[in-house]
Amino acid sequence: MTDTRHASPPRLSTAGAAALYIGALLGPSLLLLPGLAAREAGPASVLVWLGLLVLSGLIALVFTRLGTRAGSATGVAGYTAAGLGPRAGQAAAWCFLAGVVTGAPVVCLIGGAYVAELLGAGGRTAYVAALCLLVLVLAVRLGGLRTGSGLQLVLVAVLVTLVVVAVAGAAPEARAAHWTPFAPDGWGGVARAASPLMLAFVGWEAVAPLTARLRDPRRQLPRVVGTAFAVTALLYLGLAVATVAVLGPRAGGPVPLAGLLRVAIGGYGPLLAAVGAVALTLAATNAYLTGATSMAAALAGGAGTRRGTAGTVAAVAATSALLLGAAGAGLVTTAQLVAVPTALFLLVYLGCMAAAVRLLAGPVRLAAGVACAVVGLLLAGSGWAALVGAAVALVAGTRARPDPSARVRSRAPERRHNPEAGRSEPVDPGPASDVCGQSVTGP
């Protein structure tokens, strides 16, 4: 078998890179979160979406600068290690891996909910369908089948099409009365909706592997990120507004897209939504597990892929059985299930933003500081789930044994004098270790 790990990938145009970036940002969580936010905050959930879009813009700006400075050899763990040290980088890697593992059952539950809606069945059917989807994905993963980027882009295009059809087709049924009361549970409900919604914005770190495929990263990358931000912002806001304005009292359900499509095109709406949700769930979960397997192998010091696959599958199976079983028994809610991977990803982003404060300079450093503070507040607002994330980070950080020969440079950035500017500027901290090079997009 030929080793193609070091083969040079084809160069990307700005449009092609933007398409891949949008594919990394959009996922099955878009099918659930508008309804979840509306349930917690009512029409005021739109304000939460707006606020988090501003935050995601700051995060995108920071990752753009990190991507152009640190290059494709680094990922979220590499950025954290470069600014905060190798132990922090190791903790970030494990938090990200744990986020993918705990996010897998949530993604499958999204697909299961749309199947249950199609069948007109209750919540238990959704959990059974989620387990069936998960078993299928794990079997495929053990078989070694990967989800190609081409298929991912096709499925994302299908998702975008469904959202556009749903929003545009259902728009005539919007009612002003559905916007009152604007905040039925007060600002407490708005605050509760904020942390889970961050799951929709996981993916900005995917800028790392794209930089190596751009002809001129410093010129192209800002355009790529700007395009991706504009497209995703329109989709998120459009779906959030339509969910509230059209569905009204039914906005808080687990399948908002099915409800909008039913209004837009009639009885075939839930069928299209279910088919799209199941296909996206299977492909996205397989892609997440593929990336998680690679990261697990790297964290294990380069252990065999087969061993890493078996370990990842076992971890996902055990975690999913625990979480879905607890949800099916009524011990936890869907919102609480979403809170676990969200808290883990928030911890990763907190580390990246804190590292960026040390590594970068100028306005981007200020953006990183603001983003770091807001992410910290969101993490604190996630409640008990933050304790789960903190435990993972603490154990990973204290048990890590950094290799002295690793290429991670954990020092603060060196400074180089710029005669034209009359000041010193940070120097690229250099590439990170291979462990940090793994990049996995979240749900």
Where is each model-derived feature located?
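Helix-loop-helix junctions that connect adjacent transmembrane segments
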Residues: 3-7, 46, 50, 124, ...
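Transmembrane helix-boundary motif of multi-pass solute transporters/channels
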Residues: 5, 9-109, 198, 206-207, ...
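Transmembrane helix-loop boundary segments of multi-pass membrane transporters
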Residues: 35-41, 112-126, 146-155, 272-279, ...
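Generic alpha-helical transmembrane segments of integral inner-membrane proteins
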Residues: 50, 54-58, 98, 131-139, ...
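Hydrophobic transmembrane alpha-helices that form the core helical bundles
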Residues: 58-134, 139-142, 156, 278-298, ...
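TM-loop-TM module centered on a large, flexible mid-protein loop between adjacent transmembrane helices
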Residues: 77-81, 85, 117, 121, ...
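Membrane-interface loop-to-helix entry segments
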Residues: 125-173, 184-185, 225-229, 338, ...
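A generic transmembrane alpha-helix motif of multi-pass inner-membrane proteins
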Residues: 341, 354-443
